[in-house]
UniProtKB/Swiss-Prot annotation:
Catalyzed reaction equations: a lipid A disaccharide + ATP = a lipid IVA + ADP + H(+)
This protein's GO CC annotations: plasma membrane
HAMAP family (alphabetical): LpxK (MF_00409)
Enzyme's top EC category: transferase
NCBIfam families, A to Z: lpxK (TIGR00682)
Summary of the function given for this chain in its UniProt record: Transfers the gamma-phosphate of ATP to the 4'-position of a tetraacyldisaccharide 1-phosphate intermediate (termed DS-1-P) to form tetraacyldisaccharide 1,4'-bis-phosphate (lipid IVA).
Keywords carried by this UniProt record: ATP-binding, Kinase, Lipid A biosynthesis, Lipid biosynthesis, Lipid metabolism, Nucleotide-binding, Transferase
PANTHER family per record: TETRAACYLDISACCHARIDE 4'-KINASE, TETRAACYLDISACCHARIDE 4'-KINASE, MITOCHONDRIAL-RELATED
Protein name: Tetraacyldisaccharide 4'-kinase
UniProt EC number: 2.7.1.130
Family statement: Belongs to the LpxK family.
Organism annotation: Shigella boydii serotype 18 (strain CDC 3083-94 / BS512)
Binding site for ATP: T55, A56, G57, G58, N59, G60, K61, T62
């Protein structure tokens, strides 16, 4: 229902317009206060790169963060990552992730990023506190990448990167809750790079698609072509589950059942195992896998995806960030 409201297919969005105007008024006032320096943003002693969204829902932001961190690491840059840790319930904040940190403590995306990149990752509702925690323990970090936080103006930033869904784009264009917008589309004029996940990119936008890898068994780590798996049940607890189901079909998999879950939904063995009958194989997203690995069964697999950016602009962006991190 919410997708139909945000896309404009359902007329119910009009009923939510008063709340959207209120949201837009408040968010605009907050941004104006920082722009006029009525409120002071905290500036880190190292450059900060924000990777964020203008819309709610899954846009492919986390794969972009992983891509960015890995690309900078390959260039010899020491990177730290901060996140709000949506859905996390740590005993105290900021929380610096370790190999023992759970998704319940830190949230799904921070654990995934930590496991994929081995970069220092910290979570806190106050992102500046997370930055301070990383720099206190890892003073050699040269640049901070913040996963989400475009609207978190309390943290000053040097580079802003926005990721948008090239198919859904901005829906009906309205602020939450009548539409999907956290900020209006005009905000794109002030950011440094716009990355478009799928669809047809417009002038100045960097094309991106998600490239699936081999399926990975949660219990054994065994890898295989996902098309070799039989009697597949697909599970996705991400911002936009249909994208994952479409990816599986693109890989030659025709799931016997597709199970969309809420983004950041907590998972347990009983609930997940109930999705699969005898002889079936469960295939989930990597984001779900970080929550299920501790209690996984032998017929549970996940399909990792990597961000693939096209054109000349990604190299220019990486050159800019490398120079920034190096102090040049």
């Amino acid at each position: 229902m919410i997708e139909k409201i945000w896309s404009g297919e359902s007329p119910l969005w009009r009923l939510l317009l008063p709340l959207s105007w209120l949201y837009g008024l408040v968010s605009g006032a907050i941004r104006l206060c920082y722009k006029l320096k009525l409120k002071r943003a905290w500036r880190a002693p190292v450059p900060v790169v924000v990777v964020g969204n203008l819309t709610a829902g899954g846009n492919g932001k986390t794969p972009v963060v992983v891509w960015l961190v890995e690309q900078l690491q390959q260039r010899g840059i020491r990177v730290g990552v901060v996140s709000r840790g949506y859905g996390s319930k740590a005993e105290s904040y900021p929380l610096l992730l370790s190999a023992d940190t759970t998704t319940a403590q830190a949230g799904d995306e921070p654990v995934l990023i930590y496991q994929r990149t081995d970069a220092p990752v910290a979570v806190s509702p106050v992102r500046s506190d997370a930055v301070k925690a990383i720099l206190a323990q890892h003073p050699d970090v040269q640049i901070i990448v913040t996963d989400d936080g475009l609207q978190h103006y309390r943290l000053a930033r040097d580079v802003e990167i926005v990721v948008i869904d090239g198919v859904r784009r901005f829906g009906n264009g309205w602020w939450l809750p009548a539409g999907p917008m956290r900020e209006r589309a005009g905000r794109l004029k002030s950011v440094d790079a716009v990355i478009v996940n799928g669809g047809v990119p417009r002038s100045g936008e960097i094309p991106m698609h998600l490239l699936p890898g081999q399926a990975v068994n949660l219990r054994t780590g065994t890898r295989c072509d996902v098309a070799q798996l039989e009697h597949v049940v697909a599970m996705a607890g991400i911002g936009h589950p249909p994208r994952f189901f479409a990816t599986l079909k693109m890989c030659g998999v025709q799931p016997e059942k597709c199970v969309p879950l809420a983004d950041h939904q907590s998972l347990n063995h009983a609930d997940v195992s109930a999705l699969v009958s005898a002889g079936q194989t469960l295939v989930m997203t990597e984001k779900d896998a970080v929550k299920c690995r501790a209690f996984a069964e032998e017929n549970w697999w996940y399909l990792p995806v990597d961000a693939q950016l096209s054109g000349d602009e990604p190299a220019k962006l990486l050159t800019q960030l490398t120079s920034l991190a190096s102090g040049n």
